């Protein structure tokens, strides 16, 4: 009887220790990924944007920070109320990653029937890229001034 009790207690202790170790290492995963040089992508829309060709396009400044290998794709969409309608546009650029904040200007051409005008607009920027192990993307939405 005593031998069976000792076996049960020993089994319970081992199970608790193994479970604790698994829980400890499982929660360390994201920290290990962060400190081991994983993929980092960040894009920030900046203001003001510059109106071009009587509203046919705007130049939108963005700040790009990344550590992807090769180049990353940065796309920007601008939406603005224009009279009784909506002006919209899209533009993109390929950017090399330098590891620190890099200023990039993206040309956004109006795609709707309405031209852009001076004033407030909503800009959405997305960055996407890959390193040797993984791919990812990040997005930023901002209200900007078009001047």
Tell where the protein language model's regions lie, with residue ranges.
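Bacterial N-terminal signal peptides that target proteins for export
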Residues: 2-15
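C-terminal region of N-terminal signal peptides and the immediate post-cleavage residues
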Residues: 23-40
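Short beta-strand elements
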Residues: 132-147
